[in-house]
């Protein structure tokens, strides 16, 4: 007896056989598994950064406007420390400092012609606590991982009779952690 097989059926049989054969060749059989633990670690070190904004006093008049009242201004110091870090922010005496100590420096601005305008920076709004260059006279902080703003309070004492001009100074602000 002769069986009839059309070409379409034959093609489907061949394609099916090839597909099954290639699938069988690409499949691997595994007998068992093994495991291991991979330890992953990192060390986070304390870190801090600091940024400052300028302190601009404006016009000072030791004869009339500031004859009996100090001229005051504020600025900010922004610190960011890793969470849990402890740090202290200190300020040096400035470029043109007079006599004094690191704890209570005599800060001065100059016009560049040998003339000086005495000023001071403080860590409190009452302007009683000088912001100095030592740990006890600096400002202590606890890191949170987020920026923290610290206000700086400045004062130019009254009745300084000095030549007119533009006076300036630079204070180095340091964060130690």
Regions found by a protein language model. Give the residues of each.
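Short beta-strand and strand-turn-strand segments in soluble, beta-rich domains
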Residues: 129-135
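N-terminal small/polar-rich segments of proteins
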Residues: 30-111, 137-177
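Bacterial N-terminal signal peptides
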Residues: 15-24
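N-terminal signal peptide c-region/cleavage motif recognized by signal peptidases
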Residues: 26-28
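Solvent-exposed strand-loop boundary residues in beta-sheet-rich modules
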Residues: 113, 125-127
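Bacterial N-terminal signal peptides that target proteins for export
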Residues: 2-16
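Predominantly extracellular/luminal cell-surface or secreted proteins
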Residues: 92-94, 120-124
């Amino acid at each position: 007896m002769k069986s009839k097989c059309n070409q379409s059926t034959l093609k489907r049989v061949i394609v099916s056989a090839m597909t099954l054969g290639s699938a069988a060749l690409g499949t691997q059989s595994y007998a068992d598994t093994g495991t291991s633990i991979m330890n992953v670690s990192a060390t986070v070190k304390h870190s801090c950064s600091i940024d400052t904004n300028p302190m601009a006093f404006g016009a000072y008049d030791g004869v009339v406007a500031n004859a009996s009242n100090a001229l005051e201004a504020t600025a900010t110091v922004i610190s960011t420390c890793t969470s849990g870090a402890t740090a202290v922010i200190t300020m040096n005496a400035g470029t043109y400092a007079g006599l004094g100590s690191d704890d209570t420096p005599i800060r001065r601005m100059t016009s560049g012609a040998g003339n000086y305008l005495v000023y001071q920076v403080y860590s409190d709004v009452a302007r009683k606590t000088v912001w100095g260059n030592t740990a006890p006279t600096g400002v202590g902080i606890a890191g949170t991982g987020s920026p923290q703003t610290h206000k700086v309070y400045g004062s130019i004492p009254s009745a300084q009779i000095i030549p007119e001009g533009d006076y300036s100074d630079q204070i180095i602000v340091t964060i130690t952690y």
